[in-house]
């Protein structure tokens, strides 16, 4: 960054913001980079501001009174705030004085008042000087208030971040990540630009008092008629605002529904294409869009009338003020024009400035109170440790993630004493007080000596991680004692990588010891990985380590924990992402050898680890199932140990499956030992038990399937919607939402689930900070999910290893200087994570405007109609001017004869009725035309938005994966959320405002030019200067706004990164370092934002200076060239003052339109995406026994009429080459093989060899070359849809969208309920569906989180059965399955797909043993394609993977001379059918 010119700028340079010229010049000539931005002033640095506010806040906390954050802010910023407020008031006062001078100038043209004619020129100079003074006062004042608001935001940002790092884990479990981000982005952004309006809460009443005093002098009591009208208008506008909020609240749920489905579609776009669901998804989303647009139109119409009422109230304010006075006493021109000028100022103060100021104070105080409450939440307390002890002891420890009994009792007593409840009531209160669940750990005891290894195993959700947290002090024990030295190192279950180099991640603030460092690198098997990087261990890792594999991240996290010299090492399942061989080597070299003299607690599920551990602790449901040595386990729990050891290759299973088996085994043996608990009772689903949500243990850090679901408190939860009552005593603090909470209902995107959003969206679980830290909602609402890699990892179904960006809800952004708070209420959270800088130009091109206007044919005619109506209004205004001109001479004669007044009277009692009848008629006509002329425009622009959304949705669904792979999922979702919301809400009314303001200015210039042609000459250079200045500024401002948005992303990214690694941070004591990083991110954003504010003020000031010069020219031309005729001077000067304010408003609106049109440019960019290659072909009639919906019949040279295709499933692959993107490297090269009908083929290859890619290539989801034929039909001869329907797909990651069971199984509604039930029965899904209320009509939300992964796989299997496909593709379907569901799937595959061709990608040997042939993929090509005997006879990958026991199963008579040439396929021993049926759920 460059040094700021502000530091050396002089007083005038600072006053006129001239120091920004270099950056404006550079931005106009070229694209700005981050290096071009100026450094921030030292006074604005986050370090200084946070230290200042923190000192005052600590002072508040130390005081005996209740601490108030507003007092701390007052002591920091009050005097500067008041200084700029006074400047603002003085600038506003000049607006009240200007009409007085205008009246004197008009009066000087009275023939009877020739004395003042000589001073008219001086009065004109005085009027011009008032404009100059106003400009010099207002702009520094507004900038100063913006600057103070920015400083307040920075200081509170830092205070909140520091507090977040100190919060206890219990508090973190109660705060959703959305609420925390909302606290930062939503509430604090109110200070930045809102602070300039705050002073109007006292300026406006003073101004109204001054103006009414001046109007009283002119019109006496009739002046209050105009004020009364303005007050009524303000109340009407408030009522319209409430009505608009009601419509927006209703619409929020519909938008939410649409975005959830859209998000699920985007995240699972490969599955959508594989299933050929494009049309079904498009229809589903468009139906939701239709309902949403009905409410959008209503809200837009209300806001339109609200806006129009302000523009056209001017007629009636003047009319009602002047009419009573004119009818009783007559009126003169000077009073008319002075009244008009006063009323313009009065109208702005009453209907705009004061309501805005009240709203600003309401929002700001609400935000301050929220932050104040947050800053007083319970902090993490470091436990006191005995540094001399060498052992680790836990004695009868019980702990709750919720508050313990004692804490609740004390809180209850405190609450009752505060409310002065009697003792009897106190006891009653406590007896009814909800104790919020069972303990997470109960009566845990163990003791390990120095240098011993304790292996902790247990069922899913048993409390293993909670045990480690309690040792670290993150979870306070309610009972019992813990003893250890306190020198702890910690390795999290989910590897956490901070932004920085590999070396920095491992050392992590500990002093560097080269020998220890290299030893750790070697023990953690990182040497080979580091050597592959160009920069070695100085390679910079992005946030979350997205450039690393899961195994590399896990090993770096382990190395970090091992490198630290500690007494106790807590290792929470550190080997989850490692392959078997690597895991074994690291366990031996690192855990057993390098750390042999250290005390270690290892969470694991491997028998090998249990055997080598000094002590074993097995947990089940929070209790100790066993504690002792492995030999004691075998002797004391022989059934349990023999059951686990009875599994062949138990340690070879995936971690998920090992945990599943361990959970099932522990559950069975624990139930057998507890006769009081029936097995069936424990199998009941949680939603069948009334009130269980309030009673079930909230083990939120554990697996989400077993942990408690957290629902929003909504009028109708999904359980209640489906006919089930739910516990209604949930704490208000647990009110959770899809997006962060908001106080007002104006949000374009839904602000919370407090709105009844209908069947699709209710009951969505909260993503608490604690859940984020433990990754325990990996299947949460997909609306938050974003992939952060530039190209999605390809497989049959998109990857769902999500990053912190995934959980962020998306609100609309504030893309321009427009008062978006009026429409959107708050900054969109997704603005925290903006899209990549794309090819959108810095200024919207004319081509974009032209395309936008021609999207809908009616739009051009609507614009023409608006202009014609405007011309009618101008003509009506000229009629009024004609009336003025014709009545003035006559009235002057009458007044002279009567001698009733010494002033030139324009309207007398005799002529007033004639004049006012015409005036009222003209005014009513103008009002009717004005109020309704823009309605067709707004209506048509919303229709344009509807068309663009439809085209964009269609383009995304039809786009090839090679194009979609280059886009981020979050970027695509931004188009459907932020940009479509802008097209729906902001753009129509902003375009209307701009056109209206522009026409007002043009009309005023036309009238002035008719009255004084010389003035037209002055307008030409002014308009030219305005156009040039706008173009000059716009190039830079849009780039600065883009850089500012980019600068916002690291702030929130760093916050969430810190939260994900908070336990690690605390264990290593790295909070100060991360506070420094956060301040750097804040300073980077501040530099961009401060420069944007400065350049914006430079532009606003230059615009006003040009208009001041224009007014000076108009004033002197009118004063010097106009002879007799005070009416003409009054009209010219009044309109010139109006032009000055309106044209400036129009300039700002034009900038807003340009900024909002960038959203249109982005939408057009998506609409213009290429589509997948589809070749039409003629179809023939189906055979009599087949339906067209069930099979695809193609007219092809290879297929005879009336044949069903595919009939056998024979598949021939010739020279297949596949790429992810057009310009990328080939992932698969020259693949050729053939599969016989009904054959089962297994794909073999190492991780990353391209097995899943091959399955995607079969479906033409990639860029492919070569040819594939199915039953003689080439894929080049039929359409993509027809080709893909030939395949059934069972992906590893199952796609369950928000909708009913029926919709998920049959989105095209082709099958009857009877057929669906039949298939559900075949795949073992019937009993699952029947237990839900509504059965097939039960609404699944959040990716079907109420279903286990096995049930989801069964759903996928049912889809394939319904599709009647002859070729089945399976991509590791059993990777996350429990043994029961796995057996069901195996049985179904044998029965339902007995005559189908099956292509299986699987890591489990027992599944692969059923394949007849194997395709071995190495180095992007086919290495072998052989039978199983051939592979076993050679040194192949398969031979290395298969164990001797598996070979014995496969070939039981291998040494017999009578064995057949074809292998005997023997199924693994299955559980009895009765057992499967009894334990399926």
Swiss-Prot record:
Region ranges (Disordered): 1449-1481
GO CC annotations, alphabetized: apical plasma membrane; chloride channel complex; cytosol; early endosome; early endosome membrane; endoplasmic reticulum membrane; membrane; nucleus
Cross-link (Glycyl lysine isopeptide (Lys-Gly) (interchain with G-Cter in ubiquitin)): 688
Annotated glycosylation sites: 894, 900, 909
Tissue specificity note: Isoform 1 is expressed in the pancreas. Isoform 2 is specifically expressed in the ventricle.
Catalytic activity: ATP + H2O + closed Cl(-) channel = ADP + phosphate + open Cl(-) channel; chloride(in) = chloride(out); hydrogencarbonate(in) = hydrogencarbonate(out); ATP + H2O = ADP + phosphate + H(+)
Enzyme class: isomerase
Record bears the keyword Ubl conjugation: yes
Side of membrane Cytoplasmic, spans: 1-77, 147-195, 244-298, 359-858, 940-990, 1035-1095, 1152-1481
Domain ABC transmembrane type-1: 81-365, 859-1155
Protein's GO biological process: bicarbonate transport; cellular response to cAMP; cellular response to forskolin; chloride transmembrane transport; intracellular pH elevation; membrane hyperpolarization; multicellular organismal-level water homeostasis; response to endoplasmic reticulum stress
Gene3D superfamilies cross-referenced by the UniProt entry: ABC transporter type 1, transmembrane domain, P-loop containing nucleotide triphosphate hydrolases
Primary localisation category: membrane
List of residues binding ATP 2: 1220, 1245-1252
EC number: 5.6.1.6
Region (Interaction with GORASP2): 1387-1481
Composition-biased stretches (Basic residues): 1450-1462
InterPro entries in UniProt: AAA+_ATPase, ABC1_TM_dom, ABC1_TM_sf, ABC_transporter-like_ATP-bd, ABC_transporter-like_CS, ABC_transporter_C-like, CFTR/ABCC7, CFTR1_ATP-bd_dom1
Keywords of the record: ATP-binding, Cell membrane, Chloride, Chloride channel, Endoplasmic reticulum, Endosome, Glycoprotein, Ion channel, Ion transport, Isomerase, Isopeptide bond, Lipoprotein, Membrane, Nucleotide-binding, Nucleus, Palmitate, Phosphoprotein, Repeat, Transmembrane, Transmembrane helix, Transport, Ubl conjugation
Residue numbers with lipid attached (S-palmitoyl cysteine): 524, 1396
Presence of the UniProt keyword Transcription in the record: no
Binding site for ATP 1: 401, 434, 458-465, 493
NCBIfam families from the UniProt entry: CFTR_protein
The protein's name: Cystic fibrosis transmembrane conductance regulator
């Amino acid at each position: 960054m460059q040094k700021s010119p502000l530091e050396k700028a002089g007083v005038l340079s600072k006053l006129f913001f001239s120091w920004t010229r270099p950056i404006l010049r550079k931005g106009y000539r070229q694209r700005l980079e981050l290096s071009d931005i100026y450094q921030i002033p030292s006074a604005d640095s986050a370090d200084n501001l946070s230290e200042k506010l923190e000192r005052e806040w600590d002072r508040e906390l130390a005081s005996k009174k209740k601490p108030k954050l507003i007092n701390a802010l007052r002591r920091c910023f009050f005097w500067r705030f008041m200084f700029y407020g006074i400047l603002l008031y003085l600038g506003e006062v000049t607006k009240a004085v200007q009409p007085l001078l205008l009246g004197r100038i008009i009066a000087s043209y009275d023939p009877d008042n020739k004395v003042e004619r000589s001073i008219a020129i001086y009065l004109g100079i005085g009027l011009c000087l008032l404009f100059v003074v106003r400009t010099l006062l207002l702009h520094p004042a507004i900038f100063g208030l913006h600057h103070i608001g920015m400083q307040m935001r920075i200081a509170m940002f830092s205070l909140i971040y520091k507090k977040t790092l100190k919060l206890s884990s219990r508090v973190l479990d109660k705060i959703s990540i959305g609420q925390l981000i909302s606290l930062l982005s939503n509430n604090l952004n109110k200070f930045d630009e809102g602070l300039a309006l705050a002073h109007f809460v006292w300026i406006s009443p003073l101004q109204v008092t001054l103006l009414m005093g001046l109007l009283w002098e002119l019109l006496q009591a009739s002046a209050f008629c105009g004020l009364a009208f303005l007050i009524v208008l303000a109340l009407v506008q408030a009522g319209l605002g409430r009505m608009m909020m009601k419509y927006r609240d209703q619409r929020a749920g519909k938008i939410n529904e649409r975005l959830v489905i859209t998000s699920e579609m985007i995240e699972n776009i490969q599955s959508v294409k594989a299933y050929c669901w494009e049309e079904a998804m498009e229809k589903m989303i468009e139906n939701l869009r239709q309902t949403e647009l009905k409410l959008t139109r209503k809200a837009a119409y209300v806001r339109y009338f609200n806006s129009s009422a302000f523009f056209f109230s001017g007629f009636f304010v003047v009319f009602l003020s002047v009419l009573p006075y004119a009818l009783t006493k007559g009126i003169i021109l000077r009073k008319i024009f002075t009244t008009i000028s006063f009323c313009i100022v009065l109208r702005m103060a009453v209907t705009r400035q004061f309501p805005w100021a009240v709203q600003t104070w309401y929002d700001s105080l609400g935000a301050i109170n929220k932050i104040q409450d947050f800053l007083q939440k319970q902090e993490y307390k470091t436990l006191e440790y005995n540094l001399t002890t060498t052992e680790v002891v836990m004695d009868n420890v019980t702990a709750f993630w919720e508050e313990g009994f004692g804490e609740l009792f004390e809180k209850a007593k405190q609450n009752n004493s505060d409310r002065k409840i009697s003792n009897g009531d106190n006891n009653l209160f406590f007896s009814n007080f909800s104790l919020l669940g069972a303990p997470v750990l109960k009566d845990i005891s163990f003791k390990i000596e120095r240098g011993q290894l304790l292996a902790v195993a247990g069922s899913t959700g048993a409390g293993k991680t909670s045990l480690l947290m309690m040792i670290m002090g993150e979870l306070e024990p309610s009972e019992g004692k813990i003893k250890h030295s306190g020198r702890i190192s910690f390795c999290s279950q989910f590897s956490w990588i901070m932004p920085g180099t590999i070396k920095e991640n491992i050392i992590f603030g500990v002093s560097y010891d080269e020998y220890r460092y290299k030893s750790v690198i070697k023990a953690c098997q990182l040497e080979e990985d580091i050597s592959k990087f160009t920069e070695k261990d100085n390679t910079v890792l992005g946030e979350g380590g997205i450039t690393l594999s899961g195994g590399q991240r896990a090993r770096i996290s382990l190395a970090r924990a091992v490198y630290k010299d500690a007494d106790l090492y807590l290792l929470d399942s550190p080997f989850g992402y490692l392959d078997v061989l690597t895991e074994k080597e690291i366990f031996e070299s690192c855990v057993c050898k390098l750390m042999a003299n250290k005390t270690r607690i290892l969470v694991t599920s491997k028998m090998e680890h249990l055997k080598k551990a000094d002590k074993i602790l097995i947990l089940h449901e929070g209790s100790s199932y066993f504690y002792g040595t492995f030999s004691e386990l075998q002797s004391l729990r022989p059934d349990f140990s023999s059951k686990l050891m009875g599994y062949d290759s138990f340690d070879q299973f995936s971690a998920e499956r090992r945990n599943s088996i361990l959970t099932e085994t522990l559950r069975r043996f624990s139930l057998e030992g507890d006769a009081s608990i029936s097995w069936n009772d424990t199998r009941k689903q949680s939603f069948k038990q009334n009130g269980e949500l309030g009673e079930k243990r909230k083990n939120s850090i554990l697996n989400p399937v077993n942990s408690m679901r957290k629902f929003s408190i909504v009028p109708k939860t999904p359980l209640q919607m489906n006919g089930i009552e739910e516990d209604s005593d949930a704490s208000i603090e647990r009110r959770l939402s899809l997006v962060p909470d908001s106080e007002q209902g104006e949000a374009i995107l839904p602000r919370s689930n407090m709105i009844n959003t209908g069947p699709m969206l209710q009951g969505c679980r909260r993503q608490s900070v604690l859940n984020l830290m433990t990754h325990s909602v990996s299947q949460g609402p997909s609306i938050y999910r974003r992939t952060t890699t530039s190209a999605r990892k390809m497989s049959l179904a998109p990857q769902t290893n999500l990053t912190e960006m995934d959980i962020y809800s998306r609100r609309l952004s504030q893309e321009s200087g427009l008062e978006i708070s009026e429409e959107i209420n708050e900054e969109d959270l997704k603005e925290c994570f903006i899209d990549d800088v794309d090819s959108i130009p810095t200024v919207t091109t004319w081509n974009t405007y032209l395309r936008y206007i021609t999207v809908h044919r009616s739009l051009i005619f609507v614009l023409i109609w608006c202009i014609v109506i405007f011309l009618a209004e101008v003509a009506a205004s000229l009629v009024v001017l004609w009336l003025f001109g014709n009545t003035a001479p006559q009235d002057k004669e009458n007044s002279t004869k009567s001698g009733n007044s010494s002033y030139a009277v324009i309207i007398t009692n005799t002529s007033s009725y004639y004049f006012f009848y015409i005036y009222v008629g003209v005014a009513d006509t103008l009002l009717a035309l004005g109020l309704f002329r823009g309605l067709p425009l707004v209506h048509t622009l919303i229709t344009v938005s509807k068309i663009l959304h439809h085209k964009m949705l269609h383009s995304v669904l039809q786009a090839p994966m090679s194009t979609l792979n280059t886009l981020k999922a979050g970027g695509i979702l931004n188009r459907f959320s932020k940009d479509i919301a802008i097209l729906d809400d902001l753009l129509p009314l902003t375009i209307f405002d701009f056109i209206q303001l522009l026409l007002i200015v043009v009309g005023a210039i036309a009238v002035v030019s008719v009255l004084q042609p010389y003035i037209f000459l002055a307008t030409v250079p002014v308009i030219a200067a305005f156009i040039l200045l706008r173009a000059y500024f716009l190039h830079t401002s849009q780039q600065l706004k883009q850089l500012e948005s980019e600068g916002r992303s690291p702030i929130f990214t760093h916050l969430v990164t810190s939260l994900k690694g908070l336990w690690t941070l605390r264990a290593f004591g790295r909070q100060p370092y991360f506070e420094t990083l956060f301040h750097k991110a804040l300073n980077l954003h501040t530099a961009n934002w401060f420069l944007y504010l400065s350049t914006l003020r430079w532009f606003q000031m230059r615009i006003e200076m040009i208009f001041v010069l224009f007014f000076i020219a108009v004033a002197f031309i009118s004063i010097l060239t106009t002879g007799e005729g005070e009416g003409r001077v009054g009209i010219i000067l009044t309109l010139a003052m109006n032009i000055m304010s309106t044209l400036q408003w129009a300039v700002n609106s034009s900038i807003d339109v340009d900024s909002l049109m960038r959203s249109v440019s982005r939408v057009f960019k998506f609409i213009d995406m290429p589509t997948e290659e589809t070749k039409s072909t003629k179809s023939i009639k189906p055979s009599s026994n087949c339906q067209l919906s069930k099979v695809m019949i193609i007219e092809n040279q290879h297929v005879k009429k009336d044949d069903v295709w595919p009939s056998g499933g024979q598949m021939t692959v010739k020279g297949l080459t596949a790429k992810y993107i057009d310009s990328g490297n080939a992932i698969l090269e020259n693949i050729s093989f053939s599969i016989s009908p009904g054959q089962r083929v297994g794909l073999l290859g190492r991780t990353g060899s391209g097995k899943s890619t091959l399955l995607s290539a079969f479906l033409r989801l990639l860029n492919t070359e070569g040819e594939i034929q199915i039953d003689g039909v080439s894929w080049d001869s039929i359409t993509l849809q027809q080709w893909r329907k030939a395949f059934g797909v069972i992906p590893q990651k199952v796609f369950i969208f928000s909708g009913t069971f029926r919709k998920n199984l049959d989105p095209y509604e082709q099958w009857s309920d009877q057929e669906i039930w039949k298939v559900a029965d075949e795949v073992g899904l019937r009993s699952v569906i029947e237990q839900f209320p509504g059965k097939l009509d039960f609404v699944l939300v959040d990716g079907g989180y109420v279903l286990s992964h096995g049930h989801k796989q069964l759903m996928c299997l049912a889809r394939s059965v319904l599709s009647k496909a002859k070729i089945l593709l399976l991509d590791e379907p059993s990777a996350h399955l429990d043994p029961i569901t796995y057996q069901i799937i195996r049985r179904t595959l044998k029965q339902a797909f007995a005559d189908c061709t099956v292509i299986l990608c699987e890591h489990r040997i027992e599944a692969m043993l059923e394949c007849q042939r194997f395709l071995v993929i190495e180095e992007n090509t086919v290495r072998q394609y052989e039978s199983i005997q051939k592979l076993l006879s050679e040194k192949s990958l398969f031979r290395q993977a298969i164990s001797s026991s598996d070979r014995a199963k496969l070939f039981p008579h291998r040494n017999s001379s009578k064995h057949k040439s074809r292998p005997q396929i023997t199924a693994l021993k299955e559980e009895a059918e009765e057992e499967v049926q009894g334990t399926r759920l």
